[in-house]
């Protein structure tokens, strides 16, 4: 389970980085969604680790709080990037 958690955690940041490097907003959103999925996977593993006794409640709470903060940050990336897609679509339509 530790390896799966490490892979999920590294996938979060890797997908955000790849999204930042993409040229179009639609591509960025795609990678931010992949990052979001990896974060949900990690949160699931945290719950399992707590339930089977690998994590005590205090450690789980601290890690869950960090995961929830990361979730809010990712949601911000997604909302802002989606708004830029919509904004560009409106500009393109006006220029036709």
Residue ranges and their predicted role:
Residues 1-96:
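Short, C-terminally biased terminal segments at protein or domain edges
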